[in-house]
């Protein structure tokens, strides 16, 4: 099972190594605006799932939202510690 920390480490490694075929690398290459649109999309899907589709689907959408948030963190040079100090 992945944790917030292990996911961030995995995504950071893919970004640093420019792993061929990586969706993370592709998304980072498309830039902040694209990543932001994905965050908005997943946030909306999370809300719809919570409202109408149940816990399992909501958790799935939340995990996708967290993924895109972490991609944005990497894109903007934000670390886990930056997030933790603001919680």
From Swiss-Prot:
Its EC number is 3.6.1.31. It catalyses: 1-(5-phospho-beta-D-ribosyl)-ATP + H2O = 1-(5-phospho-beta-D-ribosyl)-5'-AMP + diphosphate + H(+). It comes from Bifidobacterium animalis subsp. lactis (strain AD011). NCBIfam families: histidine_hisI, PRK00400.1-1. One of its GO terms (cellular component) is cytoplasm. Belongs to the PRA-PH family. It is an enzyme of class 3 (hydrolase). It holds the Pfam family PRA-PH. It comes from the Bacteria. SUPFAM superfamilies: all-alpha NTP pyrophosphatases. GO terms for biological process: L-histidine biosynthetic process. The gene is hisE. This is Phosphoribosyl-ATP pyrophosphatase. Its main location: cytoplasm. Keywords: Amino-acid biosynthesis, ATP-binding, Cytoplasm, Histidine biosynthesis, Hydrolase, Nucleotide-binding. One of its GO terms (molecular function) is phosphoribosyl-ATP diphosphatase activity. It is found in: Cytoplasm.
